[in-house]
């Protein structure tokens, strides 16, 4: 509803029609479709809201929120002509919708683990011209090789050379947590803390 009130829906559709890349994650993924149905009025008092119509699916909001840490594989992500394949990719889901195709589209990811339980769930789709895709998986850009592949595909469109992975997100995150722990240990009376805990 916010997109429509602000007129952003027309802007996004106009840019997509010009071939500008569009990526939707979670709620953005749902909005790329034809319609978002909300029979339980989870998100609003509307029974349904028209989507952007950029992807061939309909989402129905459910009463229960899905929250999972996920591991997924990607057999092929042809976004902007790239040829990315990857396994053991990480992310997370936090959504209340179920998305169903209205006609065929290429699936992107195969979720193989949800909160440490083995599953086989298809997630995400890409359009026929390979410049629009969406997924329920948050954190896809935390996967270094996938992020670099997408950045390089965008660089190629601008006539720039491709670059290797230059930043390792998970290593950085771990080192920052270690640094935080060191700071806490240095400036906090841990012995007293454990005494209080009993």
Show where each model-derived region lies.
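Amide-donor transfer/coupling interface in amidating biosynthetic enzymes
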Residues: 13, 58-198
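Cysteine-nucleophile active-site neighborhood
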Residues: 1-80, 85-88
């Amino acid at each position: 509803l916010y997109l429509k009130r602000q007129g952003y829906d027309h802007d996004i559709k106009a840019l997509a029609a010009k071939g500008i890349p569009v990526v939707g994650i979670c709620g953005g993924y749902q909005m790329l479709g034809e319609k978002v149905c909300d029979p339980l009025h989870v998100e609003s008092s509307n029974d349904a809201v028209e989507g952007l119509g950029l992807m061939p699916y309909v989402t129905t909001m459910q009463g229960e929120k899905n929250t999972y840490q996920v591991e997924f594989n990607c057999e092929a992500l042809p976004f902007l002509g790239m040829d990315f394949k990857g396994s053991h990719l990480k992310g997370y889901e936090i959504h209340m919708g179920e998305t169903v195709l209205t006609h065929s589209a290429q699936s992107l990811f195969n979720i193989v683990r949800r909160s440490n339980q083995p599953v086989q769930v298809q997630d995400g789709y890409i359009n026929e011209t390979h410049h629009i895709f969406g997924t329920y998986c948050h954190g896809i850009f935390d996967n270094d090789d996938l992020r670099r592949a997408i950045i390089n595909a965008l660089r190629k469109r601008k006539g720039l050379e491709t670059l290797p992975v230059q930043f390792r997100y998970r290593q950085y995150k771990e080192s920052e947590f270690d640094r935080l722990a060191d700071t806490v240990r240095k400036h906090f009376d841990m012995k007293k803390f454990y005494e209080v805990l009993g």
